[in-house]
Regions:
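Conserved loop-alpha-helix segment in the C-terminal half of the alpha/beta-hydrolase fold
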Residues: 77-114, 120
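Glycine-rich phosphate-binding loop signature in dinucleotide/nucleotide-binding domains
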Residues: 133, 137
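Post-His helix in hydrolase/transferase enzymes
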Residues: 120-132
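Flexible "cap/lid" loop of the alpha/beta hydrolase fold
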Residues: 1-16
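Conserved alpha/beta-hydrolase catalytic His-Asp/Glu region
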Residues: 14-75
Length: 137
């Protein structure tokens, strides 16, 4: 059902009232005012052209669904780190990250108080994790 829905998000975004989409889009990806304002600025580029925004978002959802459908074996052969905000409510990212970590044993760092765009909610923490990760390579 999830893949089926992902493939059909473009018309949903095209017909969803723009002001509500703007509100849910900004609140859905970040917990900080800074992160929400960045998302709002990005979305406002498409103010007056919701159709284009829906096309771009729909394309992203479709390619994600197609990749999930193919379920290709792919081994990451370089040092890797998964980072996910505890309050990430964008789709099923929390579930995906848990499963990815479980299957691959790639380290997974949970960011308290952060949403989908955790780097905008907790930039110091993210930068610290990346610096630590890079120093151990």
């Amino acid at each position: 059902m999830e893949i089926w829905l992902l493939k059909r998000m473009e018309p949903v975004y095209a017909h969803y009232p723009w002001k509500l989409l703007l509100k849910s889009g900004t609140k859905g990806v970040a917990t900080s005012n800074y992160g929400r304002n960045l998302m709002k600025e990005m979305m406002l580029v498409y103010d007056g052209d919701q159709h284009r925004y829906a096309q771009i978002a729909g394309h992203g959802f479709r390619i994600l669904a197609e990749a999930m459908e193919k379920d290709l074996p792919y081994e990451i052969k370089c040092p890797s780190l998964l980072i996910c905000g505890i309050k990430d409510h964008a789709g099923s990212c929390i579930r995906y990250n848990r499963e990815w970590h479980r299957k691959t044993k790639i380290p997974l760092k949970w960011i308290e108080g952060a949403g989908h765009n955790s780097n905008t909610d907790k930039p110091e923490m993210i930068n610290s994790l990346i610096e630590e990760f890079l120093s151990n390579i």
